[in-house]
């Protein structure tokens, strides 16, 4: 199984994402918020891919995405931004920063499966 990191301050959303990824055959770890995520990532965690929320208190997902794309061991890790913010400007911003895709909440198993196929984790 491949390990995914889910970063979302909403426990219900994070747990639902985890369940969907488990159904697709992936082991998951969850960071309930940006502080927990930064602790895990700074501690050397290098997941196979990351599901990242944007709107979180404190350090938001945009800042985390920037960090992911500056850290040498995290640069190649695919990032799927999963957010309720469906503004075209947000999509442009996260894609420019290096996200692999943006999924609008509520995420579906089909949307996750499509994102995983793009990065060749699923056929």
Write out the residue ranges for each language-model feature:
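Charged docking surfaces used in two-component/phosphorelay signaling
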Residues: 15-23
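Receiver (REC) domain active-site loop signature in two-component systems and cognate sites
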Residues: 56
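Short hydrophobic/Thr-rich beta-strand motif most characteristic of the beta2 strand and flanking loop
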Residues: 25-32, 40
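Active-site beta3 strand of CheY-like receiver
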Residues: 45-51
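Active-site residues of response regulator receiver
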Residues: 53, 83
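C-terminal output helix
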Residues: 107-116
């Amino acid at each position: 199984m491949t390990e995914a990191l889910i970063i979302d301050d909403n426990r219900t959303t994070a747990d639902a994402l985890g369940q969907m990824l488990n159904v697709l055959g992936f082991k998951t770890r969850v960071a309930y918020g940006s502080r927990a995520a930064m602790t895990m990532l700074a501690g050397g965690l290098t997941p196979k891919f990351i599901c990242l929320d944007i709107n979180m208190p404190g350090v938001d997902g945009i800042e985390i995405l920037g960090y992911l794309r500056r850290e040498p061991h995290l640069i190649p890790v695919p990032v799927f931004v999963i957010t309720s913010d469906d503004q075209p400007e947000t999509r442009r911003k996260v894609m420019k920063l290096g996200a692999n895709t943006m999924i609008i909440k509520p995420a579906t198993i089909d949307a996750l499966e499509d994102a995983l196929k793009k990065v060749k984790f699923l056929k």
